[in-house]
A protein has these predicted regions:
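A residue-level marker of the well-folded mature domains of exported/periplasmic proteins
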Residues: 2, 22-171
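Gram-negative bacterial Sec-dependent N-terminal signal peptides
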Residues: 1-24
Length: 171
């Protein structure tokens, strides 16, 4: 939960730092995740909601039903950008597919904070993520040790389009 809170605080901080204060304007910050169903995303949502309540920020937590719906995530992202939020938190299902939408956000002056999975772009102000290459490498070392350094091992990666999946594969 610490990393979830960190992502939320960084995202909300970026929104507060880079938005223009307006009297009686509510601070609105959409958080667009990769999905809802996995326990991980439920923890991210809970952390984001707790941080938003603590900081007096209104958030939405949205994402596609499954982590295979890249087009749906793009639609959600475009709808959020159209509401002209003070900032945007985003976990990309595909490291390249949403770059045009993120460019629209950047052009509109909406600060972007990427989390969990980055994009192949410098549009986000920052990306908060695990070093998946090193984490997967450490796991592979432990597995090799457990099997005595010999034998065959299969790696099944959850996807080949997100920075998370690619990093875990390459580690």
């Amino acid at each position: 939960m610490k990393s979830t809170t960190l992502v939320s605080v960084l995202a909300l901080g970026a929104a507060a730092t880079f938005s223009t204060p307006t009297f009686a304007q509510e601070t609105y910050f959409p958080i667009i995740a990769k999905g809802f169903s996995h326990q991980f995303w439920q923890a991210v949502k809970a952390g984001a909601e707790a941080s938003a309540a603590k900081n007096g920020v209104t958030i939405t937590f949205e994402g596609p039903n499954t982590e295979a719906e890249i087009d749906k995530q793009t639609d959600i992202l475009n709808a959020a950008i159209a509401k002209n939020p003070q900032g945007l938190g985003f976990a990309a299902l595909d490291s390249q597919a949403q770059i045009p939408a993120l460019q629209k956000a950047a052009d509109a002056g909406i600060p972007i904070v990427a989390f969990d999975s980055g994009v192949d772009s410098d549009l986000p102000l920052t990306t908060c993520t695990t070093d998946n290459v090193n984490a997967a490498g450490a796991a592979a070392d432990k597995l090799a040790e457990a099997i005595g350094g010999e034998g065959e091992v299969a790696a099944e990666i959850h996807d080949q389009t997100s920075a998370t999946g690619i990093g875990r594969r390459d580690g």
